[in-house]
């Protein structure tokens, strides 16, 4: 069964976050020789399939998995949930259609195409040495993500089944398949700053303290400011204001306060603590309150790591393209793997139609991606 056939079947399930719609039963049917773990909460479902190939004859699989001699454990990871399709599609978003070399359907790029490719590669993998292959899937990546991959990894830690390496099949490529590998991601800090003033009548400014005037004096040091210089793989961390609110909507009353909502996408050089210190310095002697919350931490996998090297080699061999290693974009479930010390990268199809009307993936991409993933498995098992 090839990547196209599997992807078509996956698209046919209307798995809008966090609905699973029975898709895991189909996936489990493809892997009768794999062991299964499932967990979930609040309507979220997660599936983990795993198999030890070529275990020593004098060890049961479960016992062998817990010993110091356990083989390399590699995991393919992804999500089967999709965002709502909306209206104005040329065809039913959950009835896959092939047209002019493309497969159309919600999730074709994000990320049922990637999942279909690694499921097919896993089915065709037949190593000659001991190797533990696993597949981790969740129905909650597009949503809050609280009970998705993060929860499953916690369960795997309890069972001593955490992988050594993982590829998350996010749609990472920009123009051609193979042009981009995500070897890390920026962190995200959300903040709320309230500058306080004294409300009053605009005709008596001497009796007021307008917090908007206060904001104007420090705005150049807050809005769009770079918090560090970045490095080879990370852009400079930047503070971005996303919302401002002040006043009652009347034209003759100065506001009592102004609320500034902001976000900082940041590299390893900036932390919540360093951002707090910076803002405290900028706002020194001003009346304010500040709230900061880190929603995700930055991470990076070494550019010379075994996983990165094997993936690069197979991309060059199959796609005839040298991938750019980068950390651009938003957050992904790869951060949950990194938090457990797992060597993780992201690689998948082109992302030009993700979350869009008439989402589609090239048939050639699916074919090549399956070959890349199979090559990675073979390369790691032979190392």
UniProtKB/Swiss-Prot annotation:
UniProt: Zn(2+) 1 binding residues: 79, 110, 170
Pathway(s) it belongs to: Amino-acid biosynthesis; L-lysine biosynthesis via DAP pathway; LL-2,6-diaminopimelate from (S)-tetrahydrodipicolinate (succinylase route): step 3/3
The UniProt record lists the keyword Ubl conjugation: no
Active site per the UniProt annotation: 81, 141 (proton acceptor)
Free-text remark on how the cofactor is bound: Binds 2 Zn(2+) or Co(2+) ions per subunit.
CDD domains membership: M20_DapE_proteobac (cd03891)
Xref: Pfam families: M20_dimer, Peptidase_M20
Any one GO molecular-function label of the UniProt entry: succinyl-diaminopimelate desuccinylase activity
Protein's GO biological process: diaminopimelate biosynthetic process; L-arginine biosynthetic process; lysine biosynthetic process via diaminopimelate
Matches recorded under NCBIfam families: dapE_proteo, PRK13009.1
Functional summary from the UniProt entry: Catalyzes the hydrolysis of N-succinyl-L,L-diaminopimelic acid (SDAP), forming succinate and LL-2,6-diaminopimelate (DAP), an intermediate involved in the bacterial biosynthesis of lysine and meso-diaminopimelic acid, an essential component of bacterial cell walls.
Protein's name in the database: Succinyl-diaminopimelate desuccinylase
Gene: dapE
